[in-house]
Amino acid sequence: MPFKSLKELDPSEGTVQLYSGNISQQHLGDGDTVLFPQPSADPNDPLRWSKWRKHAVFLSICLFACLNNLNGTVLTDSFLTISEQLDVSVTEASGLLSWVVLIQGLANFIWVPTAIYFGKRPVFLLACAIDFIGAIWAAASPDFGSLLAASIFGGFGGGASEALGAAIINDIYFLHERGSKMSWYIISIAWGSSLGPLVGGYLIEYKGWQWGKWLGSILLGVNLLLIFFFAPETRFQRSPNPSVGSDPSLSSDSPSEKLGSRSEHLELGSNSPSSGRPSAAYPHKSYLQSLNPWSGIAPGASFWDLMFRPIPLLAYPACAFAALAYSLALAPTIMVNALSSTILIPPPYYFSIGSVGLINIAGMIGQGIGAFIGGFCIDKWSSFCARRNNGVFVPETRLLLFILPTIIVFAGILLFGFAVQLEMHWAIIFLAYGMLSVGLTGSASITMVYVCDCYFPVAAECLEMINGIKNVVAFALGYAVVPWVDNMGYIRAFGTLSGIFGGLMALVIPLLLWGPQIRHHTSSKWRLVSWELE
C-alpha cells in the first residue's frame, strides 16, 4: 500500500499567509485577509456559497449533533425508574448510555470513509434517518432488550454527527472562520448532552420514560427534513493547497526562516490556480439539482484505503494530543453525569428525579464560557498574532489559550471531589460542575481546530480518530466510575483524576515550544498517509 507525506499533499505544512496586500490572491471583501483555502473558479465550490446557504448547512449539522445527544442522554436520570419497570439492574439500565456512546464512537470508523467515498450528503441523510427510526423503535419498546437494541441502532446513525460535522465546517468555511464555527459545533454536541437529562428528568417524572424517546423522535424527524432541504453535498475536489501556490518561502527546509515572531514578509506567487470570479466554464447547479442525494464516488479513491487511512495518522503529535485532550476534557463530565443522581437524590440534598437535571444548567453555562474561549477568542488571538508576524498564520498560536480552560477544569475537578465528600451546599457542587464543563468545549474546540490547521488534507480522517477514541474512553469511564468512587471516595478519586488531567494536558507545552519544528519534520519525513488509487 503506497504512502505519502503530508508535505506532498500540502506544501504549507499548516503555515499560511493570512494577511497580505498581494493582488494575485483572493481576499475577504476589500480587506487584507487572504482566503484560505483559495476558492476555485467553480461556482459550485462550497467556499463560494452565499452566507445564508453556508449557515443553513451549519445549522442543520449543529442541530443533528445536538438532537442526537439529547436523544441519547434523555433517559440518564431515569435509570432507576427503568430498572424497576423493566426488571433489570441499574447497571444494566446504564448501558442505555454507555453502549450508545461506544457505538457512536466506533461508527465514526464507518461513516467517515463512507462519506469521503460516496459523499457527505447521502451519509448524513441515512445516518439521521437511522437515528430517527431508532428513537421511534425505542419509544415503542415493550421490554429492556428491545429498548437497548433500539438505542444502539439509533446510536450507530448518530455517530455520523460528530467527526463528519466538523469535517463539513472544514469544507465550507475559511481558516479565519474555523475557530468560532468549530466552537459552536462543539457546544451543540455538549448542550445536547446537557439538555437531554435536563428536559428528560421532568418529562419522564410526569409522562414516563417512553415520552423521552418520543420527544427525541419528533425532533430528529424535523432535523431530517432540514438536512434534506438545506444541506447539499459539500465534498469538493480542489487542488491540495491552492492558497500557497508554488512559493518557495512556504516550503523552506528551515521552519525558523518562516515562523519567527518577525519573519520576512511572504509574497505568494502570481501563478495561483484560483481566479477571483466564478468561471462560465462550470455549469451552476440549481437548487433542485442540489437536493439530489447522489453525487458519485470520489474519483480514483479506494474505499478500503479510506477505511485504513486514519489509523497511522494517530502517530502525528497534534492528532494524538487532540485525541488525548478531548478524552480528558470529557472524562470529568461523564463521571458527574453518572454520579449526579446518586449524589443529589439521597440526603442531605433530597432532589427529585426532575430536579437532578438542573445541574446541567451549570454545565451549559460552563460549556458556553469554554466555547467563547475556544471560538471567538482563539480566532481574534490568532488574527492578532498573524498580523504581528507580518501576516503569517502559525497554528500553534491557537494553543496558548488552551492553558486557560485547562486551569479552570483542573480546579473544578478538585472542587467537585471535596464538595461532594464534605457535603457542601449543592450550589458549590453546581459551581464545580460548571467549571469542569469549560474544557468540554474550550479544550476540544481549540485542539480540533489546531488539527484542521495542521493536517488540512486529511482533517476528516484525523477527526474520525479523535472522536472514536474519545467515545471509547467515555464508555470505559461509564462502567468504571461507580466502583472507582466507592473504593477511593470522592476526594481521592477526583484528586487522582485532576492529577492525571493536569499532567497529560501539560503535553501542550512541547507543542507550544517546538510545534513548528515538529510539524515540519513530521510532514516532510513521515510517510503516514495511505494513498492507494483504484
Language-model features, listed with the residues they occupy:
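Intracellular terminal tails of multi-pass secondary transporters
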Residues: 1-68, 72, 90, 210-211, ...
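Extracytoplasmic
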Residues: 53-90, 106, 111, 161, ...
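Pair of pore-lining "gating" transmembrane helices in MFS-fold secondary transporters
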Residues: 54-72, 152, 315-333, 434-435
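C-terminal transmembrane bundle
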Residues: 69, 98-101, 105, 112, ...
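Helix-breaking motifs and short loop linkers at transmembrane-helix boundaries and internal kinks
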Residues: 71, 86-87, 110, 118-119, ...
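Short hydrophobic/alpha-helical segments at membrane-entry points of transmembrane helices
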Residues: 143-151, 163, 212-213, 322, ...
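Cytoplasmic helix-loop-helix junction between adjacent transmembrane helices
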Residues: 151-189
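Glycine-rich segments within core transmembrane alpha-helices of 12-TM secondary carriers
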Residues: 177-205, 211-223, 227, 363-371, ...
